[in-house]
Each structure stands twice: as structure tokens, then as C-alpha cells.
Amino acid sequence: MNKKRSIVSNHAPQAIGPYSQAIATSSRVYISGQIPLNPESLELAGPDIDVQITQVMKNLNAICRKAGGSLNSVVKFTVFMTNIEDFNTVNRIMQNFLEEPYPARSLVQVLALPKQADIEIDAIMEL
């Protein structure tokens, strides 16, 4: 039987609803979607996509580290964006946080995200 445990990092925003920052099983960590919130103020990091994607990646990294890994342990990202025109910017900034081989990734344009964020990313990390 797979036992699951909650992963909580104080260096990433606390959940803004009835869900965990992340759930770990014996071999994987499932990280809930992270929006660009400052972990201390729970305010949006800024209006620019560069600032927002950087904050999201920092939040994801904090959760990965708390779970015993890093962003390079991620095997799959799902990216939700409100403006597909920001695709190249997202690629450029994500590349700064990752090493090859890059994880698998899906990217979906959405109408809106919580707290008027322009980007949200969830992840699956291998332990």
C-alpha cells in the first residue's frame, strides 16, 4: 500500500484552498499548481511575466528542496498561461532554472488564474 505524506515548505506560499502544497508517495512528489505569490505576503510578485515566472520557479524549487530533491528532479511540468504570446519568455526563464535532460512539459492557455496571476505551474518530481 502506498502511503502519502504532505510536503510543506515555509519558503513557498501556503495553499490558498483545501489542498496540499505537495503530496509525496514512495517514489514521487506531486506538486500543486504554484502561482507567483510571494511566500511571506501572499501578494502577486509583480505584473510582468518575467517576474511572475521567476517567482513560480522559486516557489516550485522551495517545495522540491523540502521534499529532498530539486527542480532537476522534476519529470513533468504542466504550465497554465493566460497569454500564449508569453511562450518564448516562459521558455527562456524556465531554461535558466533547469538542466538537460529537460522534463516533459505541457502548456495550456487558460482564460484566468487565481489572484489574477498570468501563469501557474504544477509538477511531478521523482524521488
How does the language model describe each region?
Residues N2-L127:
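Short, polar/acidic, helix-capping and beta-turn segments at strand->helix junctions
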